[in-house]
Amino acid sequence: IDEMNKLGILIDLSHVGPKTSSDAIKFSKKPVAYTHCCPMLKKHARNKTDEQLREIADADGFVGFASYTPFLPKGEDTTLDDCITALDYLINIVGEEKAGIGTDWVQDQDIHFFNYLSYDKGKGRPTSTPHKKVPSMPKG
């Protein structure tokens, strides 16, 4: 973290758990970010709790809202309005100046790629049920 701070590299905590996030937020001398995540409106290992979001905002960090439908409450039925509702929820926690868009969308990949993404720690621990089809963009 010291070397990243020294070199001006943004520390992205989107893919790490609560303890690592908290430790990095406390240790870093510069603001850190969740560049692409969702608030815990749906229980998912990659989503962040209100407490985690407040902690990063209190340390002048940034949170990018991910419109990745598997992380959102309605899944494949997520609409653009649902994304706006979730983004508003995020803004109410971290503030307008510390929230943005971090879509986290990957294109031109097959179902095997998305199922690979559903694992944490290699193939040792799935964080969600396997995808039956390639996730879609929000509707509308």
Specify the residue positions occupied by each region the protein language model found.
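Histidine/acidic residue-rich metal-binding segments in metalloenzymes
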Residues: 1-33, 45-61, 81-97
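A conserved active-site cap/scaffold subdomain adjacent to cofactor or substrate pockets
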Residues: 57-80
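Short acidic/histidine-rich active-site segments
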Residues: 66-67, 94-116, 131-137
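Active-site beta-loop-alpha junctions enriched in small/polar residues
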Residues: 9, 14-21, 37-40, 68-70, ...
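Active-site-proximal beta-alpha loop/turn segments in soluble metabolic enzymes
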Residues: 1-7, 32-38, 67-75
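Short amphipathic alpha-helical interaction segments
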Residues: 75-82, 91, 139-140
